[in-house]
Amino acid sequence: MHVKKGDKVQVMTGKDKGKQGVVLTAMPKKDRVIVEGVNMIKKHSKPSQLNPQGGIVEKEAPIHVSNVMLIDPKTGNPTRVGFTVVDGKKVRIAKKSGEALDK
């Protein structure tokens, strides 16, 4: 998967097209990510011990990883992700600037 938790991404398609946010959760087996402030849904919750009031809670829903692009740290624009081997380690690079994404 080309994105990881903590990456800054931009949504490229769908109702939230153009929005930027940080990846909160990556689900590689399902090819989905949860992005902060993107694809918000309203969840109805019953009253419980943790939430005695109950009611409607807004939270982020997962979106398919193909609908997001990583933000290039150098230019601030969306970029594709490439992989290269540096010192025997596989490192992600931004295709636009060639900047290494992994520290």
From Swiss-Prot:
Entry protein name: Large ribosomal subunit protein uL24
Record function comment: One of two assembly initiator proteins, it binds directly to the 5'-end of the 23S rRNA, where it nucleates assembly of the 50S subunit. One of the proteins that surrounds the polypeptide exit tunnel on the outside of the subunit.
A biological-process GO annotation: translation
Coiled coil feature spans: none
UniProt keyword rRNA-binding present: yes
PANTHER family hit by this protein: MITOCHONDRIAL RIBOSOMAL PROTEIN L24 (PTHR12903)
GO molecular function ontology, one term from the record: structural constituent of ribosome
Gene Ontology annotations for the cellular component aspect, listed alphabetically: ribonucleoprotein complex; ribosome
Pfam families: KOW, ribosomal_L24
Organism: Exiguobacterium sibiricum (strain DSM 17290 / CCUG 55495 / CIP 109462 / JCM 13490 / 255-15)
Assigned protein family: Belongs to the universal ribosomal protein uL24 family.
Annotated InterPro entries: KOW, Rib_uL2_dom2, Ribosomal_uL24, Ribosomal_uL24_CS, Ribosomal_uL24_KOW, Translation_prot_SH3-like_sf
